[in-house]
């Protein structure tokens, strides 16, 4: 079998799909994208395609090494996202060629189901509470919320009180019937992160995500030393080499690699194993589309330390398309009591409505995240 063609489709809401074709008619799908930089990743995919045409898609490990090491410069979000989508598509092809789901190629099931969590937006506590109530009605009991708005390097107590008040109201409304993680989104610098985490401890969030940016990862062990709350991070780390440093330094209780940003299934399988050796849990980051989610699920079902799976159904970013709009076999993604179950069709197990993909790709939006500024005009982290 040989790779014959690579096609990319930028799609609403903010996704990009990749199709790899072979001379035997087997097609694989991947999802290479950096939200807000889809065109840049698309260019990288097509540049890398020179290494792919005519190659045997079954040699996934060799292809991965060529894509990563053939260029003198490597790593980073753009290249690793391009590699990620290609890698997903290659696993899809291999599973289809052999007639088995990808999790079987990775050693088989280590669990029968995985708990999913849902992101809940809203600027006011009442909006967040209403969103949680709606999701509990369809079986969710685990959520992720914004931990705060933009916050200065040193900010006032009113900002801290406002962030804590939202969490307090949510905990009062639901008690211990739900669990929720708080995503700081890298908006907080180390001095305020210490204060905010301390103030939030009485409300027992499930985890604190990205209390500071990955560039400030040396603060993760320092922050972890001052709190009993689990610290999570990893969506902005792009290879096992990025994770090697934070795992060795300690501090993280949960890692959150993104299978569309961190080299795909091949790389994240290794990252998960590294984390297990450090007694660190895995909760793959996935606010993206169905191919990314399918890739995450195959990893969840073979990694013993996987504990939670993010998914984007109903997320506020999904303007113009919902998670399963491009999927034919929607029933395979059905959840029971907030849990996903293994995808048992060959390959990634996601059947793409290619006709709809082609049509919707004709007018794909160029999504950009907003640019936030502090009251003094300086740029703030979004």
Curated annotation (Swiss-Prot):
InterPro entries: DgoD-like, Enolase-like_C_sf, Enolase-like_N, Enolase_C-like, Galactonate_deHydtase, Mandel_Rmase/mucon_lact_enz_CS, Mandelate_racemase_C, Mandelate_racemase_N_dom. It catalyses: D-galactonate = 2-dehydro-3-deoxy-D-galactonate + H2O. Its cofactor is Mg(2+). Mg(2+) binds at residues 183, 209, 235. The record marks 310 as: Transition state stabilizer. Pathway: Carbohydrate acid metabolism; D-galactonate degradation; D-glyceraldehyde 3-phosphate and pyruvate from D-galactonate: step 1/3. Belongs to the mandelate racemase/muconate lactonizing enzyme family. GalD subfamily. Reaction proceeds via an anti dehydration. This is D-galactonate dehydratase. It comes from Pectobacterium atrosepticum (strain SCRI 1043 / ATCC BAA-672). The gene is dgoD.
């Amino acid at each position: 079998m040989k790779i014959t063609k690579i096609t990319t489709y930028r799609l609403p809401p903010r996704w990009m799909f990749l199709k790899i074709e072979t001379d035997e008619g087997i097609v694989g799908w991947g999802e290479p994208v950096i939200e807000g930089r889809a065109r840049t990743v698309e260019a990288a995919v097509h540049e890398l395609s020179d290494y792919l045409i005519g190659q045997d898609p079954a040699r996934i490990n060799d292809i991965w090494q060529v894509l990563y090491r053939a260029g003198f410069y490597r790593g980073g979000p753009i290249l690793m996202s391009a590699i990620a989508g290609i890698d997903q598509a290659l696993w899809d092809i291999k599973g289809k060629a052999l007639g088995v789901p990808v999790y079987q190629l990775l050693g088989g099931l280590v669990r029968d189901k995985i708990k999913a969590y849902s992101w809940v937006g809203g600027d006011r506590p009442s909006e967040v509470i209403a969103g949680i109530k709606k999701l509990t009605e369809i079986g969710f009991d685990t959520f992720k919320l914004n931990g705060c708005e933009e916050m200065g390097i040193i900010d006032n107590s009113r900002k801290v009180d406002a962030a804590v008040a939202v969490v307090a109201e949510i905990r009062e409304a639901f008690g211990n019937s739900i669990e929720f993680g708080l995503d700081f989104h890298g908006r907080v610098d180390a001095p305020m992160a210490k204060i905010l985490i301390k103030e939030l401890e009485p409300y027992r969030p499930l985890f604190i995500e990205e209390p500071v940016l990955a560039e400030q990862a040396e603060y993760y062990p320092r922050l972890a030393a001052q709190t009993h709350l689990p610290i999570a991070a990893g969506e902005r780390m792009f290879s096992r080499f990025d994770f090697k440093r934070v795992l060795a330094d300690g501090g993280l209780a949960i890692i959150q690699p993104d299978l569309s940003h961190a080299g795909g299934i091949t790389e994240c399988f290794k990252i998960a194993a590294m984390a297990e050796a450090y007694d660190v849990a895995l909760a793959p980051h996935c606010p993206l589309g169905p191919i990314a989610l399918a890739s995450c699920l195959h990893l969840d079902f073979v990694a013993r330390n996987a504990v939670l799976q993010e998914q984007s159904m109903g997320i506020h970013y999904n303007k113009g398309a919902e998670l399963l709009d491009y999927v034919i076999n929607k029933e395979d993604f059905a959840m029971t009591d907030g849990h996903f179950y293994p995808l048992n069709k060959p390959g990634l197990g996601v059947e793409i409505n290619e006709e709809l993909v082609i049509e919707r790709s004709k007018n794909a939006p160029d999504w950009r995240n907003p640019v936030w500024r502090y009251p003094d005009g300086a740029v703030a982290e979004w």
